[in-house]
Amino acid sequence: MRVKNYREIRDEPVVEEPGLTVRWLVSDLEEQPEFAMRLYELQPGAATTPHVHGWEHQVFVLAGQGVVIGGEDECLLGEGDVVYISPLERHQFVNAGEEVLRFLMVFPIPRGDAYTETHNKTQ
């Protein structure tokens, strides 16, 4: 068992995603867990680049307001909302509010080239 406070984990800017920071709460650097957990903070007016992954992930919105765009669908997001994104589903997060959009993301840790490419975007 491990317990830590998220404030003790450094937030890092995500390369190529202005206005987005990440805290690696649980990662593959810790005894090879099967799932990772990240805390993202997206600044007002900022958006992630539309992208896809070969793995599913779940998102829990902690604070703020935004929009998640998946394919042809757009859904408003707010505190307490949960999002499931299927493998290979194109998606994007947009902060449509006046405060930071803060959300947790949990996903299986992909192995191999796909993971290396995604992981390096935050270095």
Residue map of PLM features:
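A short, N-terminal "cap"/entry segment at the start of jelly-roll beta-barrel domains
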Residues: M1-E34, A114-Q123
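Conserved short histidine dyad/triad with adjacent acidic residue
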Residues: R38-H53
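A short hydrophobic beta-strand segment most commonly corresponding to one strand
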Residues: L39, Y84, E99-A114
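Short beta-strand His + acidic residue motifs that chelate non-heme Fe in jelly-roll/DSBH
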Residues: T48-P50, V68-I69, I85, H91-G97
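Glycine- and acidic-residue-biased ligand/ion/polar-headgroup-sensing regions
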Residues: W55-G66
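Cofactor-binding loop segments of dinucleotide-utilizing enzymes, especially the Rossmann-like FAD-
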Residues: A63, G71, P108
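Short acidic-glycine-tyrosine-enriched beta hairpin
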Residues: E72-P87
